[in-house]
């Protein structure tokens, strides 16, 4: 009798163990392209657009939001493998979100391309309101030594690089990938506004007065919203000091995001796309403070048109990669 009871108990335990065997985990989403924006003004659709809205309206209207622990905003993915999220403004904020998303087992980034997108400023000698720029280099503006101009010889530099930052103070993006992005940008419709056209005429630079176009160059990443001709000149000198291309865009996140991605997957599939919504200095006769805090009616205009231009230009390379995925899966094909 005792033997029978023991056998029945063992069978019951075995049956219970079998019932508790976990079902196979859902396969992770294979990400082909991840689009990162830094902020949205209100909702993802139907109101004034920030950086994320043009992407959302193109790719994720029918997609459910997925919460990722540690990320600022949900991640959206469509059936084609195009995913994206709003990461937050500034290096730390955006990097924390990007790291959380990359480490989430629900997503497979092993063959993903990254489009880091947003708005920024441009020096009037290099760009204009409404321009869209693909980065050839990402440079960190903050890393190094600085001191007050009053403590220096007049006109001498007030920045000195510091040894030890060489591997993460600048990143050269893959020239072939950038070349494809530029090629597929040709012919993209570029919007403009009457307000932006009038505002450009305050500047003497031919480039500042030009119509919006697609350009390439160095994107300068700084948590400090640096402004004025002196700091613009310093940014240009840092780009030259590091062997990068001309500084054309100032922004707050891309170099930091590149480091986060590099430590997981390298930098060979990163694109940085920025639209210019302001100049990095005032017009002739305008102080830097006046330009930073303009009187009513004295703003640049063109914000809505610029974010539309970012989406129009960036979506071309995203769509091309997805449509020709067998060719792009293993890396950018030869130009």
What is each of the regions a protein language model found here?
Residues 20-335:
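Accessory terminal and edge-of-domain segments that mediate assembly/interaction
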Residues 5-14:
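Bacterial N-terminal signal peptides
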Residues 13-21:
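Bacterial Sec-dependent signal peptides at the C-terminal "C-region" and cleavage site
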